[in-house]
Regions:
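Alpha/beta catalytic cores of group-transfer enzymes, especially the acyltransferase/condensing modules
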Residues: 11-13, 40-42, 101-201
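Short acidic, glycine/serine/threonine-rich loops at helix termini
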Residues: 19, 99-101
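An amphipathic alpha-helix/helix-turn recognition signal
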Residues: 31, 65, 91-92, 104, ...
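Residues within alpha-helical segments
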Residues: 30, 37, 71, 78, ...
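A short small-residue
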Residues: 49-56, 96-97, 185-191
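A broad detector of short, well-ordered amphipathic alpha-helices
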Residues: 34-35, 68-75, 94, 107, ...
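Helix-rich "cap/lid" substructures immediately adjacent to catalytic or cofactor-binding pockets
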Residues: 2-88, 166
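Gly/Ala-rich beta-loop-alpha elbow adjacent to hydrolase catalytic centers
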Residues: 70, 85, 89, 93, ...
Length: 201
C-alpha cells in the first residue's frame, strides 16, 4: 500500500508569481496569505505575485513567501481530497512542515519565520557569500575539491548520493564551481543571498 508524503522545499526555489493561481482558485490557499500578512505586517501577496525579483529574493521576503506558497499548495491539495501520511521539509521547509503536522500553529510558524528571516538577512549583509548545487559527483569528490580550493568553501547539504550543495566566500565558491565545470559536472548557483548552512551565518 502506497503512502503520500508532502515535502516542503527550502530557500532558492522562489520565483515571482508563485502560488498566485492557487490563491485565485482555493480559499484555503488564500487564507494562508491572510494569516501571513497579519503576522508579517506587510503585503506579502504583492511581493510574491508581482515582485520584482530584487524584492522577492531578499531573505526577509523570500522565506515568508516560500513558506506561504508551500502551505498554500498543501491546503490546495487537501481541498482536492488528497490526504498525507506524513510531511517533511528541507531547511526552511522544516518550518512549513511543522505547521502542516500541527506541531506549531500557522501564526507561530510565521512569527518564527519572520524572526529567522530577519536574523539571516542581517548575517547575509555582514558576510556575503554564495551557494552552488553540485550534481553528478559523489560527496567525497566534492569534499576533496573544496579542500583543494583556496579560500572558504565547504559542503553544507548532502541532498543525494550525487548532489551536494557547497557554500562559502563567493570567490572560493566560483573557483570550486569552475573546477567542477572542467570535470563536466553541473555547478548550479543557487538564488540565495549568502552562504547559508555555513559558518558565515
Amino acid at each position: 500500500m502506497s503512502k503520500n508524503i508532502f515535502l516542503f522545499s527550502g530557500q532558492g526555489s522562489q520565483y515571482v508569481g508563485m502560488a498566485k493561481e492557487l490563491c485565485e482558485k482555493y480559499d484555503a490557499a488564500n487564507a494562508v496569505f491572510d494569516t501571513a500578512e497579519k503576522v508579517l505586517g506587510y503585503d506579502l501577496r504583492a511581493v510574491t505575485f508581482d515582485g520584482p525579483d530584487t524584492e522577492l529574493n531578499k531573505t526577509v521576503n523570500s522565506q515568508p513567501a516560500i513558506m506561504a506558497c508551500s502551505l498554500a499548495a498543501f491546503e490546495a491539495a487537501k481541498a482536492e481530497g488528497i490526504t498525507f501520511d506524513g510531511v517533511a521539509g528541507h531547511s526552511l521547509g522544516e518550518y512549513a512542515a511543522m505547521v502542516a503536522a500541527g506541531v506549531v500553529t500557522i501564526e507561530d510558524g510565521f512569527k518564527l519565520i519572520k524572526a529567522r528571516a530577519a536574523a539571516m538577512q542581517k548575517a547575509a549583509e555582514a558576510n556575503s557569500g554564495s551557494m552552488y548545487a553540485i550534481i553528478g559527483l559523489p560527496a567525497e569528490e566534492v569534499e576533496k575539491i573544496c579542500e583543494e580550493t583556496e579560500g572558504y568553501v565547504v559542503p553544507v547539504n548532502y541532498n543525494s548520493a550525487v548532489q551536494t550543495v557547497i557554500a562559502g566566500d563567493t570567490a572560493a565558491c566560483e573557483a570550486a564551481a569552475a573546477k567542477f565545470a572542467e570535470m563536466k559536472k553541473k555547478a548550479i548557483k543557487l538564488n540565495v543571498a549568502s552562504a547559508f548552512h555555513s559558518k558565515l551565518m
